[in-house]
């Protein structure tokens, strides 16, 4: 996972970490079986991402740029607990809002970008599962 994060940075891929890792950064660590990464859904960013995936040995999966330019796409790489989920959108927050809200952080010793707290709150509120409601209580306290 560390090498994948480093490659996102070195290739200039526009991304933000969302989900439980974002929640942990903002104060509520919770076990998770994956790393959720929202990627900007543009042709340029998608081309860089496909190149990265080919570099990591996912060439057999035949990823295309269009896999990362359409909204509401989810690409899962690997298996839990080290699975990486690549998303092109999240609920309740536009991709532009999410990527603009990102804050610098560190994960496994790698500089990364985490979803901002206000955007995370809007996302949790929009998803609305019982776990998300519990997360909101912590985030807003």
Question: What positions do the PLM features span?
Answer:
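Compositionally biased terminal segments of proteins
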Residues: 1-141
